[in-house]
Amino acid sequence: MLELSFFVAFKRFSLPFYSFKPLFMSSHEKNQTTRRGFLGSIATGAAAMSIATLSPLQQLHASPETPHIPNPDDPEKLFKELNGKHRIVFDVTEPAWLVPFAWPRVFLLTNMATGTPEKENNVVVVLRHGAIPWAFDDKTWDKYKFGEFFKVKNDKGETVTKNAYWKPAQPFTVPGFGAVPLGINELQDSGVKFVVCNAAMTVYSAVYAMQNNLKAEDVKKEWDAGVLPGVTVVPSGVWAVGRAQENKCAYCFAPMG
């Protein structure tokens, strides 16, 4: 969404610059002017992006109160309890299909194959930015059309209409591995911890509210209520990634879709 806003702004403000320059300019003049125009376009595009996204982001910084975190537990608690022999955090930023759930399972399976039982490993999956829909129940997916809003596609390129990784009806099949339990609930049973970014929930719920003439606080309240059992709401995804690494988790970026 932010990237698209920047791209549109960049194209809008950069095209006129090239359209009206005399054809007889020297090569040096063209290079200098092109450079100035490019830098000016970047600045203008960045300013336009800031204006376009200011309203929802202001809720995080200008509000007299800290954004609501529905989980009553100390968000630090999960990270302080990490004490496994092998620890890893998967940083998921997009609603990718399969990868955010396959890689944690592969980490556990291959550690088991090399002598470390599941319970002696720690896996944290951080769902942030565009990946937050995986943290919600089907009721929330259906009401807010998450598949369309977050542009979630399955492996066939079809828009997803429900959380396919919450209590899946049948195991997912991974080439070379066969049927593998990749459901969020199944991974939780193996000790995997899922957390979701409250900052992203706040911004995206506000954007949804603006697009549909709803009250942002009402939408956010329903999104809070729709978080899956066992998924911890943390102040932000980047906060969680930082805490995981402070507690000796290796880092793995898992955006592939």
Task: Enumerate the predicted regions with their spans.
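Histidine-anchored nucleotide/phosphate-binding helix
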Residues: 99-116
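N-terminal secretory signal peptides
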Residues: 1-33
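Acidic helix-start/capping segments at beta-turn-to-alpha-helix junctions
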Residues: 118-140
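Glycine-rich, aromatic-bearing surface loops/beta-hairpins
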Residues: 209-257
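A glycine-rich helix N-cap at a beta->alpha junction
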Residues: 145-170
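N-terminal export leaders
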Residues: 33-56
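Solvent-exposed loop/turn segments at secondary-structure junctions
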Residues: 95-97, 129-134, 194, 199-204, ...
